[in-house]
């Protein structure tokens, strides 16, 4: 593994050293586990005690952070971003080894760039394309007419179905499926004389995954009924997410695990959806919208709004409702007592109840 002096790391991430810049570091580790030859980072005050007790040779911190006496630190504007860049230096991305494994299946009409790597039991179908320096792990299937761009990594058992397109520098984690059939059925009460049935609507569109996207393990992006389901540039989608047919996910959006987006909904740029949030179909979710975990979005959301709850409402109102809910039992008791008191007062005054 490579090693760097603290001064070299500072130059790479645009930081300032406080302490020994000549200190040589050979790895990065959590505060609790880092040794004197490793660097760590501190950006969450929950871990203040771990920071103070850490044996790390150096720690990445932000400009205003208070530092124990004698602690060597690297001050940067954004500690988490600097951590990511330093971690990449110590653990660089895997590079393709230009080869096609003997047990891989490449159709004669497929075009696989000579610099790409196709591992055992991967399959590239008729008229499919795999770009320069891309890596296909074992069990990957790139179907008929599908396209995978340059510098992509498709991990084990990824499926890119027919006519779907994956851009450049895309990462698809294990089990990800691009272009599965959308969930479309028309109810036929007669069933051509065989009784009622759900008649399958052909899903003849495709999926386009733009550049610099990452999709998590076992995430599914359904092909459009007609046209294109699109994942915008730089979007990052976690494990076990379901994107339905004809959905448009805007650039730089973040969808956390188990989010579900129903058909034909459009997400703007930079939308963030917390884990297990559900969004019904045919909605417009504006740029920069934030959706709380486990929310159920059932109406359009304007750009810049933050919503929570089910059905989702503006976050501030939801917080007030949750605060009231905690006291609901006591409020009910108080109301019951007040009603009894009113009844007693009416009885004393000789009034009839309304």
From Swiss-Prot:
GO terms for cellular component: membrane. It comes from the Bacteria. The keyword Transferase applies. The active site is at residue 245. It catalyses: a UDP-3-O-[(3R)-3-hydroxyacyl]-alpha-D-glucosamine + a (3R)-hydroxyacyl-[ACP] = a UDP-2-N,3-O-bis[(3R)-3-hydroxyacyl]-alpha-D-glucosamine + holo-[ACP] + H(+). It comes from Anaeromyxobacter sp. (strain K). Keywords: Acyltransferase, Lipid A biosynthesis, Lipid biosynthesis, Lipid metabolism, Repeat, Transferase. Gene3D superfamilies: Hexapeptide repeat proteins, MurE/MurF, N-terminal domain. This is UDP-3-O-acylglucosamine N-acyltransferase. One of its GO terms (molecular function) is N-acyltransferase activity. Homotrimer. One of its GO terms (biological process) is lipid A biosynthetic process. Pathway: Bacterial outer membrane biogenesis; LPS lipid A biosynthesis. Signal peptide: none annotated. InterPro entries: Hexapep, LpxD, Trimer_LpxA-like_sf, UDP_GlcNAc_AcTrfase_non-rep. Catalyzes the N-acylation of UDP-3-O-acylglucosamine using 3-hydroxyacyl-ACP as the acyl donor. Is involved in the biosynthesis of lipid A, a phosphorylated glycolipid that anchors the lipopolysaccharide to the outer membrane of the cell. Its EC number is 2.3.1.191. Belongs to the transferase hexapeptide repeat family. LpxD subfamily.
